[in-house]
Amino acid sequence: LHDQKLNSVKCENNQMIFTFDIKIFPQDYVGDCYKQYECYKHCDMIVEMKEESFNDYNFVSATDKNGKFEGISLSQAEFVNAINNAYTAEFIDCFANNSELKIELSVNYYNAEKQYRKYRKFSLCSVALYAEKVIWNWY
């Protein structure tokens, strides 16, 4: 999913569903990897979260010339609203540590509507979810 465009995020029935638009090119892959995924146009990353889990949703700015950066922590509802209204959001990475799943997204609010302009200074979204299971649905 590296560099794939995030289309939407929704939360329902204790699941966080990240839907990505898939566009891959043969020159970016080796061996059978391209052939395995070339026919897919979308992917849902479905995270089944633990009951009463403590999840983190953060936006972080790039480091300025003085080595300083800013960050904010959002509620789940604020995160879903903000990420679904980003100018662009792309998958960077995800990794699991025990039951914690960390997801990193590149975000851009360049052409954001007025209420989302406050996010313009942020370039990274970091999400930590306490997950029971992660399902990848390619279609």
Segments (PLM) and residue ranges:
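Surface-exposed, interaction-prone regions used to assemble/regulate multi-protein complexes
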Residues: 1-139
